């Protein structure tokens, strides 16, 4: 039987308030704090900060 993965599925939500989000994985051991990544928001049509949120 396969071992449970250390990588956790997360959701990166736009700080612009457009409702756009990306899904990705992150290693819980190496980065226990919340991620903040600058990515392109196609709704706002500019680069902005995306913050980590749990996938429901």
UniProtKB/Swiss-Prot annotation:
The keyword Iron does not apply. This is Large ribosomal subunit protein bL33. One of its GO terms (biological process) is translation. It comes from the Bacteria. It comes from Dichelobacter nodosus (strain VCS1703A). Belongs to the bacterial ribosomal protein bL33 family. Signal peptide: none annotated. NCBIfam families: PRK00595.1, rpmG_bact. Keywords: Ribonucleoprotein, Ribosomal protein. GO terms for cellular component: cytosolic large ribosomal subunit. Pfam families: Ribosomal_L33. One of its GO terms (molecular function) is structural constituent of ribosome. InterPro entries: Ribosomal_bL33, Ribosomal_bL33_CS, Ribosomal_bL33_sf, Ribosomal_zn-bd.
């Amino acid at each position: 039987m396969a071992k449970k993965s250390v990588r956790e599925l997360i959701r990166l939500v736009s700080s612009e308030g457009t409702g756009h989000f990306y899904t990705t994985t992150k290693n819980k051991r190496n980065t226990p704090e919340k991620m903040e990544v600058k990515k392109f928001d196609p709704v706002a049509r500019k680069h902005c900060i995306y913050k980590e949120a749990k996938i429901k």
